[in-house]
């Protein structure tokens, strides 16, 4: 017997009201690529000057770009890259391949993504599937060989943008960069230029000197925006995002000032303005007001890190607690082996069965993926590799959550941590 067709309950009808606030909220999102970039003309000109030789068939210098989050690094590179692609149609062909290394963070993935992007550029959808390197299953040498073949067939210049390049190095070491910075010596009809983008100003410290010398032929630092510059950016986006007279200069100025206090982060300013508008929209208001900005800031500043630590499984908390103990003793960087040794002591003190070496390593990787800790792989040549672990930001909030758990308060081995917590160190 056929079941009756599903009948909607109309759950969302009460939320679909005539929109009086937004005409296009998408222009306030990080993914939006503006046609103009206020207060980044100097940086645009610098990158364009470095890449200009590509239009005459030469290989441009590799570039490392630094700057804090929300300083316009990615948007600027994409803007210049698009201009170069368009103008190169009259000269020597150039293409931009943009990879986000927060997710594409292994040598296999990087090489495969570049090859698949380049080979699929001029193919129809059905042919792209046939020419795709699988997500797993090939030896890295095979992927590298296929990448060289793809580049040779494509010809021209491929500008490889490795966004958040520090994440790739910390996860997988610098072998990927070593290979990419030397790939031109294996090519005849094609060339590669690399642009690395990082918000970690100490990123270079993680690189082998040979890789660094090849990668950082040119370096640019993007300064934070000030309040006036952020105000200009918000005005530009607000004209497209909101209906006329919905947002006042006072509201835009407040969003800009708040974001300027957060290291001149344009992303933060855009988020604050967008969430303020969404709160006004839900309220049924006709204007975005200061109270909406204040509420939006509270929403955005909800301590997601504390919530994340609170919901960790017990074993993950024990691993994290072991790192906190080491940090409390003055250590700033730990190896996975030393963390596992302390973990076993803490687990024994808590009368908890210790997990295997491999499982603890998995938990360390999970903590890294959550952003609670940061890991980097350090190569020792013939002696192999070591995973180094550190806290990128102060541990006060993490320690507070852990030590509010009664199980850890009663653990004798953690008394130094408890004393630090009580002192507020």
Swiss-Prot record:
<dbReference type="InterPro" id="IPR015163">
    <property type="entry name" value="Cdc6_C"/>
</dbReference>
<dbReference type="Pfam" id="PF09079">
    <property type="entry name" value="Cdc6_C"/>
</dbReference>
<dbReference type="InterPro" id="IPR036390">
    <property type="entry name" value="WH_DNA-bd_sf"/>
</dbReference>
<dbReference type="InterPro" id="IPR003593">
    <property type="entry name" value="AAA+_ATPase"/>
</dbReference>
<dbReference type="GO" id="GO:0005524">
    <property type="term" value="F:ATP binding"/>
</dbReference>
<dbReference type="InterPro" id="IPR014277">
    <property type="entry name" value="Orc1/Cdc6_arc"/>
</dbReference>
<dbReference type="GO" id="GO:0016887">
    <property type="term" value="F:ATP hydrolysis activity"/>
</dbReference>
<feature type="binding site">
    <location>
        <position position="237"/>
    </location>
    <ligand>
        <name>ATP</name>
    </ligand>
</feature>
<dbReference type="InterPro" id="IPR027417">
    <property type="entry name" value="P-loop_NTPase"/>
</dbReference>
<dbReference type="InterPro" id="IPR003959">
    <property type="entry name" value="ATPase_AAA_core"/>
</dbReference>
<dbReference type="Pfam" id="PF00004">
    <property type="entry name" value="AAA"/>
</dbReference>
<dbReference type="Pfam" id="PF22703">
    <property type="entry name" value="Cdc6_lid"/>
</dbReference>
<dbReference type="InterPro" id="IPR036388">
    <property type="entry name" value="WH-like_DNA-bd_sf"/>
</dbReference>
<feature type="binding site">
    <location>
        <begin position="71"/>
        <end position="75"/>
    </location>
    <ligand>
        <name>ATP</name>
    </ligand>
</feature>
<keyword id="KW-0235">DNA replication</keyword>
<feature type="binding site">
    <location>
        <position position="225"/>
    </location>
    <ligand>
        <name>ATP</name>
    </ligand>
</feature>
<dbReference type="GO" id="GO:0006260">
    <property type="term" value="P:DNA replication"/>
</dbReference>
<keyword id="KW-0547">Nucleotide-binding</keyword>
<dbReference type="InterPro" id="IPR055237">
    <property type="entry name" value="Cdc6_lid"/>
</dbReference>
<protein>
    <recommendedName>
        <fullName>ORC1-type DNA replication protein</fullName>
    </recommendedName>
</protein>
<dbReference type="InterPro" id="IPR050311">
    <property type="entry name" value="ORC1/CDC6"/>
</dbReference>
<comment type="similarity">
    <text>Belongs to the CDC6/cdc18 family.</text>
</comment>
<comment type="function">
    <text>Involved in regulation of DNA replication.</text>
</comment>
<keyword id="KW-0067">ATP-binding</keyword>
């Amino acid at each position: 017997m056929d079941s009756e067709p599903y009948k909607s309950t109309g759950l969302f009808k009460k939320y679909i009201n005539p929109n009086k606030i937004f005409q296009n909220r998408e222009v306030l999102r990080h993914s939006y690529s503006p046609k103009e970039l206020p207060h980044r003309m100097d940086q645009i000109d610098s990158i364009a000057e470095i890449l200009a030789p590509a239009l005459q068939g030469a290989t441009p210098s590799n570039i490392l770009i630094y700057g804090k989050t929300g300083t316009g690094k990615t948007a600027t590179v994409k803007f210049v890259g698009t201009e170069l692609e368009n103008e190169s149609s009259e000269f020597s062909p150039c293409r931009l391949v943009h990879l986000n290394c927060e997710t594409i963070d292994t040598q296999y993935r990087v090489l495969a993504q570049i090859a698949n992007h380049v080979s699929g550029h001029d193919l129809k959808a059905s042919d792209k599937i046939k020419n795709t390197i699988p997500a797993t299953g090939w030896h890295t040498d095979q992927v590298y060989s296929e990448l060289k073949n793809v580049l040779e067939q494509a010809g021209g210049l491929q500008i490889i943008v490795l966004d958040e390049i520090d994440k790739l190095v910390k996860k997988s070491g610098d072998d990927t960069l070593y290979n990419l910075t030397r790939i031109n010596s294996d090519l005849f009809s094609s060339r590669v230029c690399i642009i690395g983008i990082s918000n970690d100003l100490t990123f270079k410290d993680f690189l082998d000197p040979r890789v660094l010398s090849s990668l950082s032929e040119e370096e640019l630092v993007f300064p934070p925006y000030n309040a006036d510059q952020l105000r200009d950016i918000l005005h530009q986006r607000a004209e497209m995002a909101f209906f006329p007279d919905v947002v006042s200069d006072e509201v835009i100025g407040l969003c800009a000032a708040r974001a300027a206090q957060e290291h001149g982060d344009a992303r933060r300013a855009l988020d604050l303005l967008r969430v303020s508008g969404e709160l006004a929209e839900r309220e049924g208001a006709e204007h975005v007001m200061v109270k909406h900005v204040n509420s939006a800031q509270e929403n955005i500043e909800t301590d997601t890190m504390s919530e994340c630590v609170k919901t960790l499984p017990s074993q993950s908390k024990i691993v994290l607690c072991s790192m906190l103990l080491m940090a409390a003793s003055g250590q700033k960087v730990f190896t996975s082996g030393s963390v596992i040794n302390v973990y076993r002591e803490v687990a024994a003190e808590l009368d908890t069965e210790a997990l295997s070496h491999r499982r603890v390593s998995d938990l360390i990787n999970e903590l890294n993926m959550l952003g609670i800790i940061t890991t980097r792989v350090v190569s020792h040549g013939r002696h192999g590799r070591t995973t180094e672990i550190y806290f990128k930001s102060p541990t006060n909030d993490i320690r507070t959550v852990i030590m509010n758990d009664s199980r850890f308060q009663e653990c004798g081995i953690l008394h130094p941590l408890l004393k630090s917590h009580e002192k507020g160190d």
